[in-house]
């Protein structure tokens, strides 16, 4: 831990997201985790959220990452295109689902998009149908509590 009054907020050896349960994507392809790290209550008792940053370079294999799931906290998902001349151009086609069973809805996204998934609402899978340019996928878990 870093020294000083605020050293407890500087986590120099954070967890890797791929080391967490249900996050081993070693057999998957089409994306990379650029320095993806995870801070939780074990490392910083005051940390109440997490942040995932993933560059999508190609269609993911398997295509449904992650599958349909829910959690007891809200999540924000950002899909950001990498066209410097048109930031609203996603550079591909992404399929996103919310709800399950008869309430399930699917959305086809081709522009930079922000998504809010309320606590408990089933969502996913996130399917990258086409990737023409890298797509930045950011997920933020809000007020996650003890969830891992």
Predicted regions and their residues:
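A short, N-terminal "cap"/entry segment at the start of jelly-roll beta-barrel domains
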Residues: 1-67
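Residues at beta-strand starts and edge strands
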Residues: 49, 74, 90-92, 133-136
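Short basic alpha-helical hairpin corresponding to helix-turn-helix/winged-helix-like nucleic-acid-binding
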Residues: 58-65, 69-81, 92-94
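Short acidic (Asp/Glu) patches
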Residues: 59-63, 98-102, 119-122
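A short beta-strand-loop-beta hairpin characteristic of the jelly-roll/cupin
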Residues: 79-110
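Conserved metal-binding segment of the jelly-roll/cupin
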Residues: 106-128
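A short hydrophobic beta-strand segment most commonly corresponding to one strand
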Residues: 116, 130-148
């Amino acid at each position: 831990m870093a020294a000083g009054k605020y050293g407890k907020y500087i986590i120099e050896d954070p967890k890797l997201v791929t080391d967490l349960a249900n996050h081993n994507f070693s057999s998957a392809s089409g994306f990379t985790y650029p320095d993806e790290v995870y801070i939780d209550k074990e490392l910083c008792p005051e940390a109440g959220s997490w942040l995932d940053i993933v560059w999508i370079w190609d269609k993911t294999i398997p295509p449904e990452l992650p599958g349909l799931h829910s959690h007891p906290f809200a999540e924000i998902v950002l899909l950001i295109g990498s066209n410097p001349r048109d930031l609203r151009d996603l550079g591909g086609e992404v399929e996103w689902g919310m709800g399950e069973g008869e309430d399930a809805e699917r959305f086809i996204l081709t522009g930079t998009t922000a998504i809010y998934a309320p606590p408990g609402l089933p969502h996913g899978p996130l399917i990258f149908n086409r990737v023409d340019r890298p797509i930045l996928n950011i997920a933020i878990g809000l007020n996650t509590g003890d969830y891992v």
